[in-house]
């Protein structure tokens, strides 16, 4: 009887053990998956010898396709520094940086989320909405929305966009909505600038046409050909697009920056080892002053505001 009871107890214990294993297995698997995710990029690079970098082909000077040298730009150069740091961290004799074109910043963010690329190196604004899907490095550049137009644009429209106060004469006492009524605003499709523009037009009750364009080149063409009155976009990118236009002498980018946004590099959420390496690499460039030479290559000599931005965003060791 005792033996039978012992067998019964063993059977019961085995059943309980199997039940516990069944209950705990998903938890163990989840923990293992999370642990792997935190190191997924470095593990992938160590296994394959490849770091996959997404870049925009039309976001000069941040990232663009050069006819002879391939992908170039400020963000691309930063990502190459990060690739060098990955190589050193993993003690690999060589790694290959695979450059993957993306159509827009949101496409790049989605590619990071899906694991198609390891790092998005473009002109990506770090927003809360995007942080639902990806993580971001420390800021790499201070940016914001700017406006490009023809130099012969209506004077009052230009003055308002430049932020000048209204003159006191009664003839200038027109509302914002009236001055911009039936104007055509071009903006890059599916961008943070498009969202900002649509919200602004609605807020100020402006009756205007918003025309999304595929890229900055198409937007500049719409201004040159008078199909649009104003092109809104990242101010730094607008400056580059205007300078490259064959009608550059007819174009201007207003001094005003309508928003203050930090650009950053997008990477996978939960990938803390890789994010630490990225932030440490960037902080090293900022703290050492090496960033000044890299900045100069794409934007000209950095002013005190730019240098202060890098000093403020460098993380201490």
Feature-to-residue mapping (PLM):
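Bacterial N-terminal signal peptides
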Residues: 17-32
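Extracytoplasmic small-molecule ligand-binding "clamshell" domains
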Residues: 39-123, 128, 132, 167, ...
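A conserved helix-loop-strand patch within extracytoplasmic ligand-binding domains
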Residues: 40-42, 92-103, 124-126, 132-189
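Beta->alpha turn/N-cap motifs
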Residues: 55-59, 101-105, 115-127, 150-151, ...
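Periplasmic-binding protein-like
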Residues: 57, 140-156, 235, 242-282, ...
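Extended ligand-binding regions for polar small-molecule ligands
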Residues: 76-86, 150-174, 180-184, 191, ...
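A local structural motif
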Residues: 87-101, 181-182, 201-214, 227, ...
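A ligand-binding cleft/hinge motif common to bilobed small-molecule-binding domains
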Residues: 106, 121-133, 196-203, 217, ...
